[in-house]
């Protein structure tokens, strides 16, 4: 599917730094570029610029893994009127609040909706 950047409702880009998913405010660089891999059955894996995987653990925490962790590293990209939501195996969405903190939520709302850019 190719390289993507994801900009939150609050203007922050998802970013992978120091083995954590964070946000950058207002701009994007190599830390904010993710490679989206199609894994069939409407599921994708999201790899960082350093070839690590975005994942959600059993406690619903978003983390970066050095290895593909099966269902923990698979997501469904839901498209909503030109925006995208990133839904994990556990039916939780990756979200970014107004302060740029990353969390997961079971509810689909504006914090869990991103602009998707092809990079």
Swiss-Prot record:
List residues with covalent lipid attachment of type N-myristoyl glycine: 2
* Start and end residues of each stretch annotated as Contains several HHXH repeats: 8-110
| Subcellular location(s) per record | Cytoplasm; Cell membrane
A Gene Ontology annotation in the biological process aspect, one of them, is: actin filament polymerization
What InterPro entries does the record tag this protein with?
A: Actin-crosslinking, Fascin-like_dom, Hisactophilin
Q: Which GO terms describe its molecular function?
A: actin filament binding; fatty acid binding; protein-macromolecule adaptor activity
* One of the record's GO cellular component terms: cytosol
Annotated CDD domains: beta-trefoil_FSCN_HatAB
Is the keyword Cell inner membrane in the record?
no
Q: Quick check: keyword Ion transport in the entry?
A: no
| Membrane topology annotation | Lipid-anchor
Question: What are the alphabetically sorted keywords of the record?
Answer: Actin-binding, Cell membrane, Cytoplasm, Lipoprotein, Membrane, Myristate, Phosphoprotein, Repeat
Locate the region 2 X 13 AA approximate repeats.
34-87
Briefly, what is this protein's role? May act as an intracellular pH sensor that links chemotactic signals to responses in the microfilament system of the cells by nucleating actin polymerization or stabilizing the filaments.
Q: What family does the Swiss-Prot or TrEMBL record give for this protein?
A: Belongs to the hisactophilin family.
User: What is the official name of this protein in its record?
Assistant: Hisactophilin-3
The gene designation is hatC
């Amino acid at each position: 599917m190719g390289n993507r950047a994801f900009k939150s409702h609050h203007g922050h880009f998802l970013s992978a730094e120091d083995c954590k998913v964070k946000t950058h405010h207002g701009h994007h660089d190599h830390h904010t570029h993710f490679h989206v891999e199609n894994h069939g059955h409407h599921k994708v894996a999201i790899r960082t610029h350093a070839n690590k995987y975005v994942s959600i653990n059993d406690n619903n925490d978003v983390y970066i893994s050095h290895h593909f962790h099966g269902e923990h590293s698979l997501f469904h990209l839901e498209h909503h009127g030109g925006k995208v939501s990133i839904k994990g195996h556990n039916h939780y969405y990756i979200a970014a609040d107004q302060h740029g903190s990353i969390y997961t939520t079971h509810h689909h709302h504006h914090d869990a909706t991103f602009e998707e850019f092809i990079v």
